Curated annotation (Swiss-Prot):
Molecular-function annotations in GO: fibroblast growth factor receptor binding; growth factor activity; heparin binding; integrin binding; S100 protein binding
Gene Ontology CC annotation, any one: extracellular space
Taxonomic source organism: Gallus gallus
UniProt cross-references to InterPro entries, sorted A to Z: Fibroblast_GF_fam, IL1/FGF
Binding locations of heparin: N33
Record key words, sorted: Angiogenesis, Cytoplasm, Developmental protein, Differentiation, Growth factor, Heparin-binding, Mitogen, Nucleus, Secreted
SUPFAM superfamilies per record: Cytokine
Subcellular location: Secreted; Cytoplasm; Cytoplasm, Cell cortex; Cytoplasm, Cytosol
Function recorded in the entry: Plays an important role in the regulation of cell survival, cell division, angiogenesis, cell differentiation and cell migration. Functions as a potent mitogen in vitro. Acts as a ligand for FGFR1 and integrins. Binds to FGFR1 in the presence of heparin leading to FGFR1 dimerization and activation via sequential autophosphorylation on tyrosine residues which act as docking sites for interacting proteins, leading to the activation of several signaling cascades. Binds to integrins.
Domain of life, per lineage: Eukaryota
Protein name as it appears in the record: Fibroblast growth factor 1
Family statement: Belongs to the heparin-binding growth factors family.
Propeptide feature: residues: 1-15
Length: 155
């Protein structure tokens, strides 16, 4: 490797045609705004909870393409989705409203922008009280859009 040359894992994935697949183990998405974990309930409601033992906060992230992910609750089987009004909800089937652009920020938190509404910069976000935040009310720089992927087990 030449001096100053940088290789990333995504570049290697593309170069060698490796499958994107899923991120193997379920994760918890911890929101720095209010200390909530993103939760997708069986009835399709999306919110946050501080209860680390809640089974609906275990999320499986699977890559559709480089930087594009589906987020699915392992307990409810619902996919995180954002409708045309920017409301977060759980969907039974993966579709275009369920794809999110995942970005690692400089502060080591991740942000998730709805791919369908990427031109509007609508992020996944949680309010301090744990309610989901409407896409049009989110913007870059808010704590509400920052999520830290954590392992399910605390050990």
């Amino acid at each position: 490797m030449a001096e100053g040359e940088i290789t990333t894992f995504t570049a290697l994935t593309e170069r060698f045609g490796l499958p994107l697949g899923n991120y193997k183990k379920p994760k918890l998405l911890y929101c720095s705004n209010g200390g909530h974990f993103l939760r997708i309930l069986p009835d399709g409601k999306v919110d946050g909870t501080r209860d680390r033992s809640d089974q609906h906060i275990q999320l499986q992230l699977s890559a559709e393409d480089v930087g594009e992910v589906y987020i699915k609750s392992t307990a409810s089987g619902q996919y995180l989705a954002m409708d045309t009004n920017g409301l977060l909800y759980g969907s039974q089937l993966p579709g275009e409203e369920c794809l999110f652009l995942e970005r690692l920020e400089e502060n080591h938190y991740n942000t998730y922008i709805s791919k369908k509404h990427a031109d509007k910069n609508w992020f996944v976000g949680l309010k301090k009280n744990g309610n989901s935040k409407l896409g049009p009310r989110t913007h870059y720089g808010q704590k509400a859009i920052l999520f830290l992927p954590l392992p399910v087990s605390a050990d």
